[in-house]
Amino acid sequence: MRITQGTFSYLPDFTDEEITAQINYALTNDWPLSVEFTDDPHPRNTYWEMWGLPMFDLRDPAGVLMEVNACRAANPNAYVRLNAYDASLGRQTTALSFIVQRPAEEPGFRLDRAEGRGRAIGYTTHSYATERPVGDRYTQG
């Protein structure tokens, strides 16, 4: 099951050239970028691990792509995403966010139903990947 989070999630994975074009677009709009990674892509897990610090002063698309590739190399079985931030409204908001790397296999989610008070049904999603230990969720074995 392909995780669909962020901009471009329904498109095929981007090449480095296409990622560079998006980086250039963000930098042209004065949006600083950051790289994040996780092995728990649950839709409510909005706080992924940061790769280094946000690149507020980096103006070169090649430098940002170098950080993306360093994160990919260090976390080959994780989801990696690139975020661009817009502070033009007086607060830091996400202007662009998209996944630049996925594990080879994405096991998907299970929907759990539970009956509550007054026979109200509550729903919870559970990632099959989280049944394995952190750091071992997308490796073969």
UniProtKB/Swiss-Prot annotation:
Gene Ontology BP term (one): reductive pentose-phosphate cycle
Coiled coil spans: none
Induction: Transcription is 18-fold up-regulated by growth on H(2)/bicarbonate compared to pyruvate, RuBisCO activity is induced by growth on H(2), H(2)/bicarbonate, formate, methanol and CO.
Cysteine pairings via disulfide bonds: none
Record text on subunit structure and interactions: Heterohexadecamer of 8 large and 8 small subunits.
Family to which this protein belongs: Belongs to the RuBisCO small chain family.
Function: RuBisCO catalyzes two reactions: the carboxylation of D-ribulose 1,5-bisphosphate, the primary event in carbon dioxide fixation, as well as the oxidative fragmentation of the pentose substrate. Both reactions occur simultaneously and in competition at the same active site. Although the small subunit is not catalytic it is essential for maximal activity.
HAMAP family reported in the protein's UniProt record: RuBisCO_S_bact
Protein name stated in the entry: Ribulose bisphosphate carboxylase small subunit
Species, as recorded: Pseudonocardia dioxanivorans (strain ATCC 55486 / DSM 44775 / JCM 13855 / CB1190)
Phylogenetic lineage: Bacteria, Bacillati, Actinomycetota, Actinomycetes, Pseudonocardiales
